[in-house]
A protein has these predicted regions:
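Exported/extracytosolic protein signature
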Residues: 1-445
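C-terminal outer-membrane/trafficking sorting elements
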Residues: 446-457, 461-532
Length: 532
């Protein structure tokens, strides 16, 4: 709708259902969906009554950047909006720059700078008002090529009215580098955890450790991992069931890249952005991307990038897209239009348009074409002004629910400079999957006696795991299963050559240790991973 609440659609003749949806929890839709019939060259008028349930600001913030080019100035764009039902007084935004980015200037200027944190005073945001912040920063010339840089932003006030106070635990995750170790800390900022949950540690693109944790209110748990040379570390810690999205995601996430450098001073890159960063809180956001030496100036980026060449993601992962454009012609562009045909596997009802480099408006045409209109834009050509010739716009969208594994989601955008033919971006695509991250859990850690073959499958497992031992050892054999705290979970007798099935009856997900002993002594030991 426009500022007066009026809306219009251009439709082909036919029957339609018209309803309203909002991500803002301050409205009550008091009427059922409207059924309308439109004839050719006809106009239908429909009112959509709604009731305001809370008069309160609903402040959101988003961040995007065309690129973090190596050894040159970067443009960072922040969009702060009040989508609530009441003006937002004393509004401010904090932006924390990556350690490798040095602040150069901004419009508007910050009212304070504390290290890498910039504070901007927005005074009062009216209902449905948005304010842009444009920051210029310089990338450190000594940073590794391809390193990931993150910009975080938070808007205040950040209260969401009408929500039930959360009375459960609230886990926060942090990551630091301490000499030769990556140190994760899990802090419970809520009530005592009633049950244990699991945390998972990733090293680059494999799962390195899964272990349980349970924290009382205010308790902090430190997890220290010896840093492998060049590796990227990430931790995911489960929140309690029904954890509200306005407080964060169902997992707490932290990561650290390049704690222990390679001999050449570099480190493994590209692993942070292939996973979801965890940004569901409306008043907070984090934007991460790798620095580049050269890049396609007109493309469509997706975050997370997805795992491996198939860009695997888990079902129900929120998707953040950034469309980048640059005027590489020989004259100023005065209008840019972007048309992005949204895949039917994405839910347009969940669309959230984010930050952009220039003022724009957007609409949806022909059912599923998302259109961004920058008119006027006055975009100089790259020969006249390399920095100012770039632009970008971002949006978030959710997957359709419960897509089956193997589903591929792909789409691309067309970028129109003035009245020239469109530049078509490469496809951005994902594949839905599960259990695609390999685990550093060997089926057999050690086979102590030779000539004995121990088979354990599947591993990881969910409901049951199979054991089979073949070899010269004489039975019976004893299988002992313990958790990581050394508590015995199960003990069974096995026979050489026979297959044994171990059922996971009400076990907690996580890593378990097994040992097989025979008359001659220990035969083998290993790890099992029970998945949720």
């Amino acid at each position: 709708p426009n500022d007066s609440g009026y809306y219009q659609f251009q439709l082909q003749g036919g029957n339609y259902t018209l309803s309203t949806q909002s991500n803002v929890p301050y409205f009550n839709w008091i009427c059922p969906p409207s059924l309308i019939s439109v004839n050719t060259y006809d106009t239908a008028t429909v009112d959509l009554p709604l009731e305001i349930t809370n008069y309160c600001p609903y402040n959101t913030v988003s961040v995007t950047s065309p690129a973090f080019p190596f050894n040159t100035t970067s443009q960072i764009n922040v969009l702060a909006c009040n989508n609530g039902t009441l003006f937002s007084a004393n509004t401010s935004v904090e932006v924390e720059l990556d350690p490798a980015l040095s602040f150069v200037s901004s419009i508007p200027p910050p009212i304070a700078q504390n290290g890498q944190v910039l504070t901007f005073d927005l005074d009062t945001l009216d209902i449905l008002e948005c304010v842009g912040i444009r920051i210029l920063a310089q990338l450190d010339t000594l940073t590794a090529l391809g390193a990931t840089h993150c910009v975080e932003a938070r808007i205040f006030p950040d209260t969401i009215c009408g929500t039930m106070p959360w009375t459960g635990a609230r886990i926060q995750a942090h990551a630091t580098c301490n000499n030769d170790s990556v140190v994760f800390s899990l802090e419970n900022q809520g009530a005592d955890m009633l049950t244990g949950k699991n945390y998972t540690v990733y090293v680059d693109d494999v799962i390195f450790r899964i272990a349980p944790f349970q924290l009382d209110s205010g308790e902090v748990m430190e997890i220290r991992e010896e840093a492998l040379v060049g590796a990227t570390y990430r931790i995911e810690a489960e929140q309690e069931p029904n954890f509200p999205t306005y407080l964060g995601d169902s997992i707490a996430i932290a990561f650290f890249e390049g704690c222990a450098a390679l001999p050449n001073g570099g480190f493994n890159v590209g692993f942070i952005t292939q996973f979801y960063l965890g940004t569901s809180i409306p008043s907070q956001t984090i934007f991460c991307q790798e620095n580049v030496f050269a890049y396609d100036p007109n493309d469509k980026l997706a975050q997370p990038k997805g795992y491996g060449p198939d860009h695997l993601i888990y079902n129900n992962t929120p998707l953040d897209y950034t469309i980048r454009f640059q005027n590489t012609g020989n004259d100023t562009a005065r209008r840019v239009i972007i048309r992005d045909t949204i895949s039917p596997l994405l839910d347009l009802n969940t669309l959230e348009v984010g930050a952009a480099s220039h003022n724009f408006r957007y609409d949806i045409v022909r059912g599923n074409i998302l259109r961004f209109i920058f008119d006027p834009i006055i975009l100089p050509d790259s020969g006249a002004n390399q920095l100012e010739s770039n632009g970008s716009v971002s949006f978030r969208i959710q997957l359709q629910p419960n897509l089956p594994d193997g589903t591929m989601i792909q789409n691309r955008a067309g970028i129109y400079f003035d009245y020239n033919p469109p530049i078509i971006t490469p496809y951005a695509f994902y594949t839905i999957g599960s259990d695609f991250v390999p685990l550093n859990v060997s089926n057999t850690i050690s086979e102590i006696l030779p000539n004995n073959q121990i088979k354990v499958w599947p591993n990881p497992f969910r409901e049951a795991v199979h054991f089979k031992i073949e070899g010269p050892s004489q039975g019976p054999l004893r299988l002992t299963l313990t958790d990581l705290q050394g508590r015995q979970i199960r003990q069974k007798t096995l026979q050489i050559g026979n297959e044994f099935v171990l059922q996971a009856d009400n076990w907690a997900a996580g890593v378990y240790l097994y040992q097989i002993d025979g008359p001659e002594g220990p035969l083998a030991s290993g790890k099992l991973l029970l998945q949720p």
